[in-house]
């Protein structure tokens, strides 16, 4: 008996590819560091000003350390998918207490501090940035300019860390392998080639420069505002305490009267800010571009060189880690679109432990798409009612009750309206006062007396009614207060506003992360394999599942369309400010269009064989409506392309 072929895990092929991409991003950081080191060179010697083993190389190594911190941070925190939450304040509450938040802020602050030390060491002596200055009689004085520059760069690092967390820079925007206009364009490997990614990085350089300049100006304004208000006295005392044992400094810790905000100082701070911001932005851009290359190697799928390519691919598709599963699904979509040999291998792979390869791929893709429906059901499901505890009699037995049983009314039920309660009390009090006399109520009243009593009571109630018409509850009061003073403001109400875009992403893509490319590639892969089976499935195993595939895609497409486009997701009461782009979610729209396009491909290819697939005319008509097709195709009586399985 032949030995079973070892199935290598999918990560054995993905990890080397990712490591090569990490190395390429590191080279970009090194080139950026060497370029900035050249900018700070004094060019007093034609050799040592640029030679890597001289002072320039030492500065480049330290600058490289500042950039590599960002790469290490990205490696430890990268994730596919967008963060899904109903409001920004919900995102803040969920992610702010985590260790990764402190790690991000500390990484950028440490990188900025190291950069400030290197930059101060390269500033010319006549710039006035030495730590100790000497005036008359050789008396040493502490210079505030380097203190402000270092503080500014550290604050800029914290500011960049906050922007990093707010913009979710750690997210990887994975691609898709959808056919364009129904045609399958062959994958040549250019999307995953290093030269293509470097060309894209080069095209991003002007944007990186503009972004660095803009953020540097914002950071300088922030530092100039916070430094004298919060940090100046403390930092001055700390520096005086540390340097007084080394220099003959004054005993007083009072800072100078003038702030170090001269034009030359601010220009130096701005130049240093642009350099360090450029290093950070270049590192982040290179990492984001290079890591999301297509799962191809030399124009072939990553698992092409495996001993068991289908088994390794299945291992990735079944992996519980979202990043590995997304890359494996992306590779499957490429196979369904561009690689007929691998498609035939999937159709002909029958002797697997858990069933044929096609059956497992079909189930995995449909389970992935069913997640969308499950997410919608979970989001729209009403909260479970609170369970009432059993009565004490069931546990202690029947005993004689000595008091009235407890009330079972809802304790949080609203009180009767002020209007009805007031009217009832006034009416009863007025009638009792009228009927009561010195000797008690009379036995009866005359008709005239009754009419007079009724008219007086009505006039009194009408006069008191305007004061008791409006019912005010605490919830309605605070809601009106929030709508009037907080949510109506575009800036103040932003953290609490639950926009339709955010709620759509949470409802459809799930939480805490939702990766649209996973669902797009799943729909593209299963539909592409089904359509290709007409020519490449020699045994006709795929056609057994075509009818159920059409029904599942029809049901899912109808549910998504009803929820997203037909009012299934209403407008939240906090969404009171009309902002452009907040009404639609691009990621959800991409998923909806992918499901619709997959259904269109399958129904166009298999509608002529609907009778043999046991699809009714109603099912075909419904599928065409969901897919957006109009004209019907005549059903063929003879189907030589298909193999009927009885």
From Swiss-Prot:
Coiled-coil region: 542-602
One Pfam family this sequence matches: Ndc1_Nup
UniProt function note: Functions as a component of the nuclear pore complex (NPC) and the spindle pole body (SPB), probably by playing a key role in de novo assembly and insertion of both structures in the nuclear envelope. NPC components, collectively referred to as nucleoporins (NUPs), can play the role of both NPC structural components and of docking or interaction partners for transiently associated nuclear transport factors.
UniProt-recorded name of the protein: Nucleoporin NDC1
Transmembrane segments: 21-41, 53-73, 104-124, 145-165, 208-228, 272-292
Major location category of this protein: nucleus
Record keywords: Coiled coil, Membrane, mRNA transport, Nuclear pore complex, Nucleus, Protein transport, Translocation, Transmembrane, Transmembrane helix, Transport
Family: Belongs to the NDC1 family.
GO cellular component, as recorded: nuclear membrane; nuclear pore transmembrane ring; spindle pole body
Bias kind Basic and acidic residues: ranges: 396-407
Region (Disordered): 380-407
Topological relation to the membrane, as annotated: Multi-pass membrane protein
Gene: NDC1
Organism of derivation: Chaetomium thermophilum (strain DSM 1495 / CBS 144.50 / IMI 039719)
S-S pairs: none
